[in-house]
Amino acid sequence: MQKYISEARLLLALAIPVILAQIAQTAMGFVDTVMAGGYSATDMAAVAIGTSIWLPAILFGHGLLLALTPVIAQLNGSGRRERIAHQVRQGFWLAGFVSVLIMLVLWNAGYIIRSMENIDPALADKAVGYLRALLWGAPGYLFFQVARNQCEGLAKTKPGMVMGFIGLLVNIPVNYIFIYGHFGMPELGGVGCGVATAAVYWVMFLAMVSYIKRARSMRDIRNEKGTAKPDPAVMKRLIQLGLPIALALFFEVTLFAVVALLVSPLGIVDVAGHQIALNFSSLMFVLPMSLAAAVTIRVGYRLGQGSTLDAQTAARTGLMVGVCMATLTAIFTVSLREQIALLYNDNPEVVTLAAHLMLLAAVYQISDSIQVIGSGILRGYKDTRSIFYITFTAYWVLGLPSGYILALTDLVVEPMGPAGFWIGFIIGLTSAAIMMMLRMRFLQRLPSAIILQRASR
């Protein structure tokens, strides 16, 4: 029992800074929305539309680079720290290549925006302008993620938290300058949010690099002799590990976007109630997601040390802590669902629907916690391909179709509206949790030599 308590302390010490970093990131988006809304409703809508296109694109690159964390953790655990610098340099090359592709996609996203049904031309122009300003921050964001993954792979999660809050503090005044045109800068409105956010990502990257150069604990790995050229073998391996994670993230983000589109014709009350419940659920999701990042680090480190039993302990402890957290957040959601809904909107119909949907959200929080921590465990074992297959099957083969049938058709019951989609979420997330656990159990039953061989690739 003592080993699980000790492991839980280590996991929480890693996870809490990740939680705070994620809160800072979420707050940046909130600040952009509020400050753009203070300028005009059109500018706020433009930022919302631009963000809905930016997120799937940049999260794809983010997911690709998540492969670095277990690779570095495993090298650190095995005492092969001299190889970490080369992996990081190749991560920067990969981030550079991917950022160019993302920038090209975002530059041409105007075709998507202007093809939206009944969109106001002025709104479309502002959304395109916002994206074309923001896309210059894509390299800065991805380079920052490489540096952050280096730190987190070495079990140092506090730097990412500090840089997140530095970014938030810089974002507010820079937003103000570019939205309203102060200190000789042009008055850009919502487009100014894109300029500010792009600048902030570069500030965060440069601040993180400055920290790494000065950190004594990383002095032995930050210098590499000669100029590091692209290494096709290393980059191929990073892509093999990262692409399934990137696709899984992409499928998850697009799932919720598709559901939002399917709910939109049902009316203002249904859309508002759905959005409130989804927004609150996303806030609660930060807890297991951050714990999953910590579990990836611990499992990778233990496998690097050659101890499959300690890796199992880290995995099981992560799941137990995650289930406890989810139980508490579910109780909190059920107990205060109406008060929470009132924080967003005071329309009685909207509050009633949102409170009802939050009951369903409380049901799936435990499944959601298990599936996301399970994904973190599999990343630690470098078994990322199975994450893609499980995510795609659970969300797009089981969850979305069942939600659509329940919400919009009478094949099973009378059309349930948004609640049908939320039952679909429960089906999808529970299926993902079951499949993640089965895969984890399969991996942990393999002979230790095979597990360690797979982890060292």
Swiss-Prot record:
<feature type="transmembrane region" description="Helical">
    <location>
        <begin position="11"/>
        <end position="31"/>
    </location>
</feature>
<feature type="topological domain" description="Cytoplasmic">
    <location>
        <begin position="297"/>
        <end position="313"/>
    </location>
</feature>
<feature type="topological domain" description="Cytoplasmic">
    <location>
        <begin position="1"/>
        <end position="10"/>
    </location>
</feature>
<feature type="transmembrane region" description="Helical">
    <location>
        <begin position="93"/>
        <end position="113"/>
    </location>
</feature>
<dbReference type="GO" id="GO:0006855">
    <property type="term" value="P:xenobiotic transmembrane transport"/>
</dbReference>
<feature type="transmembrane region" description="Helical">
    <location>
        <begin position="314"/>
        <end position="334"/>
    </location>
</feature>
<dbReference type="GO" id="GO:0006814">
    <property type="term" value="P:sodium ion transport"/>
</dbReference>
<feature type="transmembrane region" description="Helical">
    <location>
        <begin position="350"/>
        <end position="370"/>
    </location>
</feature>
<keyword id="KW-0406">Ion transport</keyword>
<feature type="topological domain" description="Periplasmic">
    <location>
        <begin position="181"/>
        <end position="188"/>
    </location>
</feature>
<feature type="topological domain" description="Cytoplasmic">
    <location>
        <begin position="210"/>
        <end position="242"/>
    </location>
</feature>
<feature type="topological domain" description="Cytoplasmic">
    <location>
        <begin position="371"/>
        <end position="386"/>
    </location>
</feature>
<keyword id="KW-0813">Transport</keyword>
<feature type="topological domain" description="Periplasmic">
    <location>
        <begin position="408"/>
        <end position="417"/>
    </location>
</feature>
<keyword id="KW-1133">Transmembrane helix</keyword>
<keyword id="KW-0571">Peptide transport</keyword>
<keyword id="KW-1003">Cell membrane</keyword>
<dbReference type="GO" id="GO:0016020">
    <property type="term" value="C:membrane"/>
</dbReference>
<dbReference type="InterPro" id="IPR022913">
    <property type="entry name" value="Multidrug-R_MdtK"/>
</dbReference>
<keyword id="KW-0046">Antibiotic resistance</keyword>
<keyword id="KW-0653">Protein transport</keyword>
<dbReference type="GO" id="GO:0046677">
    <property type="term" value="P:response to antibiotic"/>
</dbReference>
<feature type="topological domain" description="Cytoplasmic">
    <location>
        <begin position="148"/>
        <end position="159"/>
    </location>
</feature>
<feature type="transmembrane region" description="Helical">
    <location>
        <begin position="127"/>
        <end position="147"/>
    </location>
</feature>
<feature type="transmembrane region" description="Helical">
    <location>
        <begin position="276"/>
        <end position="296"/>
    </location>
</feature>
<keyword id="KW-0739">Sodium transport</keyword>
<feature type="topological domain" description="Periplasmic">
    <location>
        <begin position="32"/>
        <end position="52"/>
    </location>
</feature>
<feature type="topological domain" description="Cytoplasmic">
    <location>
        <begin position="439"/>
        <end position="457"/>
    </location>
</feature>
<feature type="transmembrane region" description="Helical">
    <location>
        <begin position="387"/>
        <end position="407"/>
    </location>
</feature>
<feature type="transmembrane region" description="Helical">
    <location>
        <begin position="189"/>
        <end position="209"/>
    </location>
</feature>
<keyword id="KW-0812">Transmembrane</keyword>
<keyword id="KW-0915">Sodium</keyword>
<dbReference type="GO" id="GO:0034614">
    <property type="term" value="P:cellular response to reactive oxygen species"/>
</dbReference>
<comment type="function">
    <text>Multidrug efflux pump that probably functions as a Na(+)/drug antiporter. Confers resistance to many drugs such as fluoroquinolones (norfloxacin, ciprofloxacin, enoxacin) and tetraphenylphosphonium ion (TPP). Also to deoxycholate, doxorubicin, trimethoprim, chloramphenicol, fosfomycin, ethidium bromide and benzalkonium. Also able to export peptides; when overexpressed, allows cells deleted for multiple peptidases (pepA, pepB, pepD and pepN) to grow in the presence of dipeptides Ala-Gln or Gly-Tyr which otherwise inhibit growth.</text>
</comment>
<feature type="topological domain" description="Periplasmic">
    <location>
        <begin position="114"/>
        <end position="126"/>
    </location>
</feature>
<keyword id="KW-0997">Cell inner membrane</keyword>
<feature type="topological domain" description="Cytoplasmic">
    <location>
        <begin position="74"/>
        <end position="92"/>
    </location>
</feature>
<dbReference type="InterPro" id="IPR002528">
    <property type="entry name" value="MATE_fam"/>
</dbReference>
<dbReference type="GO" id="GO:0015297">
    <property type="term" value="F:antiporter activity"/>
</dbReference>
<feature type="transmembrane region" description="Helical">
    <location>
        <begin position="243"/>
        <end position="263"/>
    </location>
</feature>
<dbReference type="GO" id="GO:0042910">
    <property type="term" value="F:xenobiotic transmembrane transporter activity"/>
</dbReference>
<keyword id="KW-0050">Antiport</keyword>
